[in-house]
Amino acid sequence: MRRMPSRPPSKLSLLTLPLAALAACATGQGSPAPATPSSGSFPGAGAATALPAPASGAFESLEGPLWVAAQSAVLFSDVVEKNGPAAHIYRFDPAARSYAVVPTPETSPTSTNGLAVDPQGRLIATERYNGRLVRIEPDGKLTVLASRWPAADGPALNAPNDVVVRADGNIYFTDSDWGVRTDVAHAPMAVYRVSPAGELSRVLELQKPNGIALSPDGTTLYVGSDTQAKVWRLPLDGGGAAGTPTLLIDGASVPDGFKVPDGICVDDAGNLYVTNNDDAVKAIVVFDPAGHLLGRIAIPFRPSNCTFGGADRRTMYVTTLHTVFELRVPTPGLP
């Protein structure tokens, strides 16, 4: 957020997001790697600087940052409260230092959370309060990709949270119960996959799944559970099916606090940047692909998610409750 394996996949495929789309718009097996003793700052990372506040006033609850290379801009969701003002997807232009609202096809609040782009350049979004995964077509129409499990007449999804798209079009998303509707029956919280053919399948049943990301080669899926303070990894085959999950990071073994893993982004070296959405340790915690702790990047407020952007993909954008921060990092990463 790419064709595999020549280019790494991510939440953004780095393919063109059409202007029309913007205008219309289980427990794991095995043991985690031990954390290293050092838990200080992450070498080469700059200080986090707040983006300017929008003229329209304060944001409500920011999530889902997504760098769009074709627009040289970052998108993010203002999730808002279920009964609050209308939710929006915002676009920030780093060159102009200005914001714009990305129009969506529906006038009702959608409370989008996670954002991604598929190989055709279409915007994919989770809708927390509508309980569904949607796609915004180039002509502005909205296509619902998932809303119930295991069938169209089955229980409703809970509150889809984060999403990532592989280069071959496989979509993976987390479904937690944050802000879930109480007037309908719900499926168990889980991680789901929508195949390129549009088939919905359950990847992993998991308590409070949240952040989700892919390895640079698209062969590993990472999923975090914020209430369990754990991050799992799952192997993916050539068709996109997931294998047995293994526990990669256990917050109990990470020194100096790793209690609320929220969003996940990955750099070109395969290192994981996990936002720790916790007042005690407000930071992005960095791990190598084996789960060893590399350090922390301090963020002034509790971070919710992150994305790599800029022309060299070395500018990280981090969402917090009311503010977006930017900082420079030493290694390019996946949007």
Q: Where do the PLM segments sit?
A:
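Short loop/turn segments immediately following beta-strands, especially the blade-tip
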Residues: 234-241, 328-335
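Short loop/turn segments immediately following the C-termini of beta-strands
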Residues: 79-80, 128, 176-178, 226, ...
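A short helix->beta-strand "capping" segment at the edge of beta-propeller domains
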Residues: 37-59, 245-248
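Beta-propeller domains
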Residues: 74-104
